């Protein structure tokens, strides 16, 4: 029954400040963050590496967050994807959640909000790990 203290989290956002801030928050909580700056890079990274969760911007040039989410569901990657948006309308939130997002996060986000989401993901990860061993 191995439980993990450290999650490996991918951050996909086209804004440098968002990527760097979120990565710093994740690192500060004792987890590992890796960042890419667009959806196509996110897709390629998810093809090649395993992550425990991903924070993905809803609107990006090229492959947007919603299409990356849908692709990950089609490929059955099974990782929780949190969709982030600076234009967080109820319709956007509903679309993300109905498409299989783990959560919807409006920008600007708080450390408390990020911490709560990561703790929930970690609890779920540890529960699944415990039940499979």
Residue ranges with predicted function:
Residues 50-55:
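Active-site beta3 strand of CheY-like receiver
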Residues 44, 66-77:
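Short amphipathic alpha-helix used as the core "switch/output" element in two-component signaling
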Residues 91, 109-118:
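C-terminal output helix
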